[in-house]
Each structure stands twice: as structure tokens, then as C-alpha cells.
Swiss-Prot record:
The gene is nuoF. Binds 1 FMN. Binds 1 [4Fe-4S] cluster. GO terms for molecular function: 4 iron, 4 sulfur cluster binding; FMN binding; metal ion binding; NAD binding; NADH dehydrogenase (ubiquinone) activity; quinone binding. It comes from Buchnera aphidicola subsp. Acyrthosiphon pisum (strain APS). InterPro entries: NADH-UbQ_OxRdtase_51kDa_CS (IPR001949), NADH-UbQ_OxRdtase_suF (IPR011537), Nuo51_FMN-bd (IPR011538), Nuo51_FMN-bd_sf (IPR037225), Nuop51_4Fe4S-bd (IPR019575), Nuop51_4Fe4S-bd_sf (IPR037207). This is NADH-quinone oxidoreductase subunit F. Pfam families: Complex1_51K, NADH_4Fe-4S. Coiled coil: none annotated. It comes from the Bacteria.
Amino acid sequence: MNRILRISETHPLTWRLRDDQKTVWIKEYCDKNGYLSLKKALKEMLPEDVINIVKESGLKGRGGAGFSTGLKWSLMSQNHSYTRERGYLICNADEMEPGTYKDRLLIEKIPHQLIEGIILSAYALNVSRAYIFLRGEYVQAEHILKQSIQEAINFGFIGLNILGSNFNIELVLHTGAGRYICGEETALINSLEGRRANPRSKPPFPAVFGLWGKPTCVNNVETLSNVPCIILNGVSWYKNLSKSSDTGTKLMGFSGNVRNPGVWELPFGTTAREILEDYAHGMKSGFSLKAWQPGGAGTDFLLEEHLDLPMDFKNISQAGSRLGTALSMAVDNKTSMVSLVYNIEKFFSRESCGLCTPCRDGLPWIVKILKSLEQNKGHKNDVKNLEKLCSHLSPGKTFCAHAPGAIEPLQSAIKYFRSEFESGINIRKRDLNKKIIGIQSNCI
């Protein structure tokens, strides 16, 4: 996190960050208004009041989908089976999207903000057990969370009869086994149950039939970290933070060959050009911007002409991409789009769960074709075949959203840089095809 002026009124997620980059432990967190939201909710509010405030605030999921958090909570609380047996809350901290590191920042530097958000959300959902599903490679984050959870227990924020409210909460930390597909909520639930991490068929949705058959809500780290400030400061304040129809702030960033790569908390509606030039300080000397991805490896490429778009769910979608995690990657003029997309598709192919045939067989086929094009050994119809494969991996034709997300960068790269892919067709084979066509025409 690069140093910028941060205050609680404008940077609710990051104002507590220390300049020395050390972790904010519970005593310091409490000195900076920590757990005041929890005390307010438990003493002054009913669970449904918390849900209504979060719904009115317009908070959307920060994991990439952008679904209304309050509505998601309402679906769980209104479920009939929910009234008979309690369910579970799961914090999705399995951050494995290439180029994304925002959740790691929140976990390692301000862990109690996340923990407070989890406890508040559990209270709103009337659940007594919550889980943090953490990426297995985040070893330092695991140690920090274990210590922070124990601190919260020692201070009486986790356990039985929290703050004399008759509300009980148990928080369990679970580390994953390195599967990207666990970012999908039902695959995560299967993994947490000890099963193979395959997505489930929906419906039933987790809000009805989730972890161990109980109603379950899965929320992202950044989403849950927003809850305390909303409860403490109110709906109007939260909405006024934004410059867009999407409310609040968002962790945004730029990586690639930029002078100052990083992540910053900025209002929704900040343009990509502002982030690139004012915060990332532009491209490195000798490089110019060729393309950029708005929010992770699984989002469509955009061009320099799109930099003036406000970074929010609606505007990025209208431009033909997705906001995703809002951590953008700059592609410089010296990068081969074929090589870049080849590496991206190799990742997605390797991370396929293998459950459905289009994804299991289609992605490796795409990788094989891209490898040939990268080595200038491509065949005449390779680019067309890539487009055909993409049509078979589009939304609605696979079991989950893994393959449709995987083909987004490929489709957009072909759309904007088709000549680079066509240049990978073997020249010798092209000349041979021309000769064959010439011979055939002479024979007619």
C-alpha cells in the first residue's frame, strides 16, 4: 500500500494502516474506534436492523460479482429452513486471481477490521459459527489471523454471551489446498466439507442448502471489512463516499510495467487514467500502454481509449469487460499478446476442476493452439478455431463460470490484436497453401 493521506472520513478501510507496514493488533485497533460498531449493534440493533442498513447502503460484493450484500443476506434470513436451524457464514479469503492482492493487505495489516466485520455479519444472519477459508499459500496471513482470533477471544469479542448480549460466535480458520476453483462459493463449500473442490449445481443456492446442508452465506474479505464502518457511520455517509452509482470505496490498483505499482483505497467512479497516472505514476521509461485488464486475469482487455472510464461495475461492463477485483494490469507495447494470453490460458486450464467436458477438454485445446501460434507453427484456421472454441465455452454451456471467465482475455485479445495471432501461422505452410491453390486453379 503506497503512502497517501488517509483519514477515517474518506478511507474507511485503510485509514488505520501503519506507515511502517506493521500489523495493527487489537489494542491499537480498539484505540482507533475498533469494535465500536460491534458494541453499537449488539446494544442498540436487532439482526434485521443490521441487514436493512447494509442493504440500504448499497454495499456490493467486492469479490468480483458485484451482487448486493444486503439482498444476499436477506435471501438467507428469509429462507424457511433458516427459521428451524441455524446456518453458517463463510469468509472467502481464497485469493488466487493472478494480479490480485487486495485481501492479503487487509488480512495481514488490519486483521481485526475483518474479524469485526465477520462477527457483525454473523450477528445479522443469526449464525453462531463462522469460517475463514484462507488461501493455503498465505502463510504469514495464517499466523496473523490465528493470533488475532485469539486476541479477540481474550478481549471477549468471540465466544459465549458476547458483551452480555446472549449472542455466541465461534470463528474457525481453515486453509485451502491450492485450488483456484475454490473461489467459486459452492466449490469452496465442498472443499470445507472435505470433498473434492467441484462446483455444485444451482439451485439450490447456498442460502438454502450450503455447508453440511445448512443455509450458508459466503462473502469476500473486502466485503465483510466494509460492514463495521457502515454500521458506525450510517448509510448517507457511506453513499457520499462514492462518485458513482456504486456506493462506498474500493481497493483499486495497477501492476505491470508501471513506475509505482500498488493498491489504493479510492472512491467508486475514479477513472482508470487517474489510477494509472496519479497513483501508479504512469508507465516506466521506454514503455507505453498497449492494453489493460480492469480486474484480474479473467477479465477482458481494454485499450488506452478506455482509460477515462469510471471504475465501477456499470461503466466497465458497458465497455465490454468486468470490474472484477479492480486491480488492473497494464500491458506494455513490448509484450506479445499471444504469449501473454498463452500464459493466462495455461493457468486457467491447469485450474479447471475437470467436472464438465467443455472446460476439461476445451481449455487444454486452446492452450495447444496458442502454443503453436506463439512458436510460429500455427495452422491456417487456428484463429478461427480459437473463436469456435470460445463459443463452446460461453456462459450457459459449462457447469460454472470458470471457463467463461477464462476465455474473456482470449476473446478480447483476438478482437483488438487479431494480426498478432494471425502472424503466428507458419509462413512456410501459408506459402505451401498458396502454391497448392495455384496448382489447383491451373488444373481447372
